[in-house]
Amino acid sequence: MGLSLAAYAGAALAEIAGCFAVWAWWRLGASALWLVPGALSLGTFAWLLALTPVEAAGRSYAVYGGVYVAASLLWLWAVEGVRPDRWDMGGAALVLAGAAVILWAPRG
């Protein structure tokens, strides 16, 4: 379980950082050199997501979706300086609950 959570959290950080690099170049006028670490971050994201111990890619992606929503709100607050509101937090709680059901449901 620890490796799974670490892989999902690392994947979220890598994807958000990679996407933000493109955002910074495209929307904020940052240098095109931002695209280099952005591409590396997105490659790291894919690699980390492949490490998750889930038997089907689609299920792994579904669980990751919940982690991504929560991590995006942390990024919003920590990096962009915008505090998430109660609707953001409520939505994140809902998707994390759904991700937990998908990840830990008994299958057999």
Swiss-Prot record:
Q: How does it sit in the membrane?
A: Multi-pass membrane protein
**Matching HAMAP family, A to Z?**
UPF0060 (MF_00010)
Q: What residue intervals traverse the membrane? A: 5-25, 32-52, 62-82, 86-106
Q: Which NCBIfam families match?
A: PRK02237.1
Q: What is this protein called?
A: UPF0060 membrane protein RHOS4_03690
Annotated compartments: Cell inner membrane
Listed GO CC annotations: plasma membrane
Q: Which InterPro entries match?
A: UPF0060
* Major location category of this protein: membrane
| Stated family | Belongs to the UPF0060 family.
Q: Which UniProt keywords apply?
A: Cell inner membrane, Cell membrane, Membrane, Transmembrane, Transmembrane helix
